[in-house]
């Protein structure tokens, strides 16, 4: 057995122990543990190991002078609290979120617009980002009888990947490997199906540059092209955790499942239609993130690729 397989087995064993411990703990205690780990990571772990500078630069790029140093640090600390709470929520999700108790756990914003899109008979692309708890979103749609195909990168550890596959498909959703997803997405669109994917990943030099928080960000063209080719509606949304002040008396964490925007590609048939469509869903995601900035993954290098004009100016 090679070292990699040994490491994978150890990782999976540790993960199973973590699952057992988290399932045994009350919700409040599990949240407190998540907050404690976030405090240690933010205050005690060397910042070069936690990509602190990347998060800080991203926040400064997104919000400019509207955030002072203290507010930036509070947002980064809040981001880590959110991420560790999300891990705990994923462990609890299969037993805590059921169809009969959805209204106790979820508030809905824009629900009617989302339902109309799903019942339109047209293919639908659900777009989200590294924001809130995206697992709650797709899990909820499965419970309500609207299963969809979820595009995600395969995990390196095959045992962990299988666990997450079973978790994501437990409510009827289907997992699609990000590598080679294009052909499968086209088949889904041809059948009038629904698919969910992230739209805030850097697309490299071949991407389409549109503004994200007022700064040009390379964005995949494929989303807009799919929508335009197959007349697919685009629904931008996500599930974000409600503030602690609104959690009082709840048996589990509560979320707002928000439909931020529903976009019809028929409105973008002009010469610049692809750019305008891509800009609209990117702006919609930005508006969603502004609802709870601390629940966005700011260590994600969204602005990694610079436009050609900026690269040429730097080289001159």
Language-model-detected regions and their locations in the chain:
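Short, flexible loop segments at the rims of nucleotide/cofactor-binding pockets, characterized by
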Residues: 100-105, 153, 170-176, 213-214, ...
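Short Gly/charged-rich anion-binding patches and loops
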Residues: 17, 54, 112, 136, ...
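Soluble or luminal CAZymes and related metallo-dependent hydrolases
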Residues: 13, 51, 106, 177, ...
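Non-catalytic C-terminal accessory region of glycerolipid acyltransferases
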Residues: 2-6, 28, 65-69, 77, ...
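Membrane-anchoring hydrophobic helices of lipid-metabolizing enzymes
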Residues: 1-128, 172
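Active-site metal-coordination segments of metallo-dependent hydrolases
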Residues: 48-54, 154-158, 217-220
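Catalytic core of membrane glycerolipid acyltransferases/transacylases, capturing the structured
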Residues: 93, 120-179, 205-208, 212
